[in-house]
């Protein structure tokens, strides 16, 4: 609804320029699916979706669609601040305009979204941009009655007196829209009160014309000129008279009187002053000097008091205005929502009215058809009386006239106010009803009115009870709303407390930053003092240390950023997969529901068809009884001929049926072969179970993938730590610094993850295609069912039209005879095709001729006349009925025969196609086994080569581990030596700190060991699970292999298998290449590590020689060595045990991988197997259903043929008995026949009367049901509307609670991040203290040895440059910090000015997001 309103608003705007249209068309041409998704997400306000789509390449949120609007414009017009933040962070041209020339600032000002406007102004959006009407954003804000947006625009330099195309300023538009507060605000900001448009009209004139009293009053108070004239010579009083507003006229009169009095006083003033001056000069000169001083002091005091009061009042007014603006925005949004709901209600009402009209029209047509049906039945059953026909014609005509009159009359008129002709339409046409007097009619009407009033009273009581119930519910809802408000107030208080805590932490962080500054200044002074007496070598070492620290920090930050990006990408991919799975599940459920609905509808339609067939049979029986007596003999001979001919046809049909059965048997055999191939088809229940298991497995695999990714990340981190340790060793050795900078670790885990995710996406796409195919097949089945329903309805209507009165019966008989002739021609054509069965047909024709000769005798024996009379009558009636049934069945059989032929032809074609495919696409088992054996040999060779490479790789890894262990041992020995040096030359405090650090490292190592043991237990459990799953898969694969050995293999499967194997071989080759590369890399690393080890040993020896020269105490060194060696040995033993466990796990994993690969090579993938299974199951089900239907039809036909044969034999026996006996005259026979027919006609008349009475009773019952249903529908609509309102209110409450919980969660996260930042600051302070200690130690060394002055000057220069760079970094950090604090304070001030509304919550969310970004 909102999108429709926005479109209508755009259509109301005057036509844009050609350039805007051309741009829109150009952008619309480039519009793609991502732009459409982005537009839908922006309209829904889905921030996550918007950010995910913006992350893709080539997405531009400023692109215009066909309607000339962009995503950026939609977000700003709806006031969605989070989406707008996402778009602005992504990057967009802020000055982009739509087809009306409006940019985002115009739209934010037009719809009163002050926060969006503030955000756009922060991104330097121009305020002077004008649309095609020449209006700026200030014009739109003045029209939208949004004072906060006007204040923001004016603060950012928007021109208050800007004019549009018509020359109107924002003040003119505000007065025209009757916005007095905005008029006052604009005047305070410097708006010209007397500015004129192109017709020289002022704001006062337009306010008088449109009757805006408050705005006119504000203008007059602020000095608007009343006497100005426009281009036509009219003043403001003329416009006030046009507006017919007496209050404005009185205001103008008072203002004009005040101005006239002032002018008169100004004119008279000089003469009076001259007179007074002449008389009073002497008196005033003495006292003036005394009083002036006191008056000036008093006035100054009063001015200061008034100024303070004015300031307070202005502040209070601003606060109140902000509150009022917030409330107005909320009211506007609620009004929009209410308007949308009302429009939707009106649409639903209109739809309900249209459906009720359609229902009434259908009921009327049903009643008319029933009347016609009665009319036709009376024509058939009656003996041709004209009176009854005319009477029913009159009834039908009067019913139609009554329907037309009821449609013409208005629904508002009650039933008792209508005319008697409307209430009693038959009263005018029937002269037999004149006996009723008018008094009796009036009494009946009064009784009807009383019943109507009583029903109305009952309805009124029911409605009152329902209203009371709803009032109670509303009260309960009001109580709940109050409770929710109280809860929200408490949560708001908690949020305010949290804000205060955040402020405190910000201040503490500022203090820590200041401490850092002081530390750096102290360092600077210390360095400058030591530079005067320092060494060149020491300065170089300090430089190296600083560079190393910078490199470490930069590398760590880059690696952390990479890891974060990888984690975010993985989370996005997992979320997308979850959404896709949910969508697929929902689509599956929806399709299952549609299937159940279709089956229900099919069953209902089948029941209706059976009922209609029963009715048709009853009507055919009635028609069979309504044949006249005179034409019985002619019909007898013709029917006997037809019976004989149909017997022949039945014989031919039986032969054709046998042929079709033989073909069906062949098809069954082929189907059995196909079934043998697909013996393992699954039932739908089992399929669902398997599907659920697979979904569980997929979920478990997803979890395993996430765990593996975490393990990979941990391994990467450990590798990175090892390389960092190597770098530290290189820095100490001074020789390998340049070489280690060029070596980096390759990150290939992301590529493997991408490949796995691509495979999963392909599987999901295949599933989607299968679901869509099923959906299309179900749609086709639905269309077929609808066509069958239409054909059945047409057959029913055809049967209704077939029952014709006896006058037209002869014509129909002639038409039937012509049809019979045509059928004979068709049968003659079929006879030509069936030449083999002519002998049996000739025998049957000879027998029929003999029967005809025997029936030609016109006399019956006397003795058995009375006994045979009843039997003949019964048999004749039965034969007539059965013949009619046989006619219908014969026609149905012909149609079905044609259909069966078509199906047989289709099946033959399919068989031929399948045979051709089998010849072209099938391979013998020998060839397939030869190919499989060759492939298995190649796979074994590849696996053997892989095993060798893996063995080499493991050996290389073991050697690397040993080298790492040796490097660690050497490193620890160097650490012990350094600690000894520090103990000798440094104080005891540093030695204690080292011991503490060593204990902390021991604790960390123990924790890591415990974590690794836990991981090992988890991995063992996973291995067990994998073994169980592999056992299950093995069993399934063995069963599949047993089934596949007995069956032929399709070329498609073999091709697919070959492709899969080729792919796998390619993948294995790639893995071989990768492993070989890794092996070479490992060798290179090994050689480098050996070289490093040699160099480090040489360095250690050099250090030991130095230590020997310098007398070190051996007791401390030996104690430290013992303690360190003990801990190192323990750690080595634990590491070795862990490595052994890890190698065992790797061996088990490789074995499992090999088993899986063998199973994959020897089996078909499950997805393909399931797809083929489903396709064959569908085909088999369809063929089974068709075969069952054909078998049932053939059984019915065989039963009918057997019945006919038994009847023919009975007739033959009766004829033989008649020949042996004597013959009686036909006159008696005819007399008895006429008596029986008269009895039958009388019974038919009675039946017709009973049917009429039954139908009248049914009509009365239907009318009563319709009234009850209409009353129930109205009640249900009321209930539904009230429940919807209740649900909407509950949803709003839930949304507010969710936003509050999100705020709490984000505040907690920000607190955690602030703590992390504090920890980092403390770590930096510790590093600074360590540097100080190192410098102090070096300063002692520098005092012993002296150097020349040139080196000292160079050292001083370099140190000064370093200090300057550090100062610049500190200044930049301070600036960023102060900018953040400024933004934070502005948001806090906006929160402190009013309550915690939605806007303030959004601002707090923005602050928390910025804090997160700064911490990161």
Curated annotation (Swiss-Prot):
The keyword rRNA processing does not apply. There is a cross-link at residue 1035 (Glycyl lysine isopeptide (Lys-Gly) (interchain with G-Cter in SUMO2)). The modification N-acetylmethionine is found at residue 1. It comes from the Eukaryota. GO terms for biological process: intrinsic apoptotic signaling pathway in response to DNA damage; intrinsic apoptotic signaling pathway in response to oxidative stress; negative regulation of inflammatory response; negative regulation of non-canonical NF-kappaB signal transduction. Keywords: Acetylation, ANK repeat, Coiled coil, Cytoplasm, Cytoskeleton, Isopeptide bond, Nucleus, Repeat, Ubl conjugation. Highly expressed in skeletal muscle, heart, kidney and pancreas. Expressed in choroid, retina and epidermal melanocytes. Expressed in eye muscles and thyroid follicular cells. Component of the apoptosome complex, composed of APAF1, pro-caspase-9 and UACA. In the complex, it probably interacts directly with APAF1. Interacts with LGALS3, ARF6 and ACTB. Interacts with RAB39A. UACA is a possible target autoantigen in Vogt-Koyanagi-Harada (VKH), Behcet disease (BD) and sarcoidosis that cause different types of panuevitis. Regulates APAF1 expression and plays an important role in the regulation of stress-induced apoptosis. Promotes apoptosis by regulating three pathways, apoptosome up-regulation, LGALS3/galectin-3 down-regulation and NF-kappa-B inactivation. Regulates the redistribution of APAF1 into the nucleus after proapoptotic stress. Down-regulates the expression of LGALS3 by inhibiting NFKB1. This is Uveal autoantigen with coiled-coil domains and ankyrin repeats. The gene is UACA.
